[in-house]
Amino acid sequence: MGTIQVDLGNRSYPIYIASAILDKIGTYLSEQPLGKKVLLVTDQQVAPLYAPRVIESLKNAGFKVAVAEIPAGEPSKTLEQASRLYDLAFDHALDRQSSVIALGGGVVGDLAGFVAATYMRGVPFIQIPTTLLAQVDSSVGGKVAVNHSRGKNMIGAFYQPQMVMIDVATLQTLPERELKAGLAEVIKYGVIWDGSFFTWLEKNYSRILNLDTTALEQVAETCCKIKASVVEQDEREQGCRAILNYGHTVGHAIESLSGYGTYLHGEAVAMGMISAARLALNEGILSQQDFERIYRLISAVGLPTELPRGLGPQDIIDSMYHDKKTVLGKLVFVLPRSLGQVDIFKDVKEADILAVLSQ
C-alpha cells in the first residue's frame, strides 16, 4: 500500500492508496481520535455498489452509522441538499466528535465536506473517493463547496479531511465516460508539474482505460504527491496553488452556461485546457509541438477537444468574469510554457481570449 502524508502542521493527514482496502475503513478509523457516530454520505449510484461493505466495516469497528443517499451528479451540490444533511445529522444526534464520511465522486466529496466544515463549526471529515477524478484531485487539498446559480463552487470553504482512503478497485465499476473525465485532471498534472509524467501518460493511457491495477495505483500516487506538494506550499490558494486551476477558467464557464450535469467536470476542464494551451500558443508562450502533444493526448483518451457549438464566445467570457478566480475584475489564466511548467497570468486581454474561443 502507498501512503502519502499531506504535511499541514496540526491539519496534516494521510492518503492511503491500494486495491481492495474498502473493507478496512473501520479499522483505519478506529486508529483516529474520533467519536463513534458517523454520517456516511453517498449517492444513489455508488450506494448499492459499496455502501454495504463500508457500513459493515464501520459497524464491526463499533461505529454507529447514519446513511444519506443523494441523487448522483452535479445538480446535488446545493444548499438545499446540505440542509437535508444537517437535518439528518441532528436527527441522529451527531456531535462535534462525530464524523462525516464521503463515499463517492467529487460531488459527494464537495457536498459532504461542506457539511462537515459547517456543521457545529466543523466536525471530522473522511474521504473515500470512488471516481478517478476524485481519487487524483478533488479528495485531496480541502476545497469543499456547493454551487450557486451565479457560479460553480461559489459557496464553500477550505477544510482538510482527517484521512483519504483511495481504493482503486472501485474504478472497476466506474462508467467509461466518468473514467475518461477523470483522465482530464490526470493530464493536467503532467502539463502543470511533471513533463516526464505527461510522456508516461502518452505511452500508458490505454492501461488506465483498461483499468490496469498497477497503472491506476501509480497514477493515483503520482497525482496525489503533486497535489500534496502544491497544497503544502499554498493551502488557501494565495499563490502557487492557482496552477491547479489550469483549464478551469473556461471549464467552469462551460459547466455553468451548459447547465450543471450537461458536461462532466473533466470534460469541461479538457476543453478549457485546450483553450488555455491555444491561448499560450497564440501568445508565443507555448511551442507548436507542445500544443499538439496536449491536444493529441486529450483527444486520444476520448475527451472533447472543441467548445460546445451552442455557447457563444462572448457568453463564455461574460461567465468567466463571475468566476471567483478573477482578480480586481481581471481574467486570470494558467497558461503552459512547456510540458511541466505553467505560469499564472492575471491580466489577459479579452480580445485575445475571444480570438481563441472563436477558432
From Swiss-Prot:
The keyword Oxidoreductase does not apply. NAD(+) binds at residues 106-110, 130-131, 143, 152, 170-173. Zn(2+) binds at residues 185, 248, 265. It is found in: Cytoplasm. Its cofactor is Co(2+); Zn(2+); NAD(+). Keywords: Amino-acid biosynthesis, Aromatic amino acid biosynthesis, Cobalt, Cytoplasm, Lyase, Metal-binding, NAD, Nucleotide-binding, Zinc. InterPro entries: Dehydroquinate_synthase, DHQ_synth_AroB, DHQ_synth_fam, DHQS/DOIS_N, DHQS_C. One of its GO terms (cellular component) is cytoplasm. Pathway: Metabolic intermediate biosynthesis; chorismate biosynthesis; chorismate from D-erythrose 4-phosphate and phosphoenolpyruvate: step 2/7. Gene3D superfamilies: 3.40.50.1970, Dehydroquinate synthase-like - alpha domain (1.20.1090.10). Coiled coil: none annotated. Its EC number is 4.2.3.4. GO terms for biological process: amino acid biosynthetic process; aromatic amino acid family biosynthetic process; chorismate biosynthetic process. Its main location: cytoplasm. It holds the Pfam family DHQS_C. It is an enzyme of class 4 (lyase). Binds 1 divalent metal cation per subunit. Can use either Co(2+) or Zn(2+). It catalyses: 7-phospho-2-dehydro-3-deoxy-D-arabino-heptonate = 3-dehydroquinate + phosphate. GO terms for molecular function: 3-dehydroquinate synthase activity; metal ion binding; nucleotide binding. Belongs to the sugar phosphate cyclases superfamily. Dehydroquinate synthase family. Catalyzes the conversion of 3-deoxy-D-arabino-heptulosonate 7-phosphate (DAHP) to dehydroquinate (DHQ). This is 3-dehydroquinate synthase. It comes from Desulforamulus reducens (strain ATCC BAA-1160 / DSM 100696 / MI-1) (Desulfotomaculum reducens).
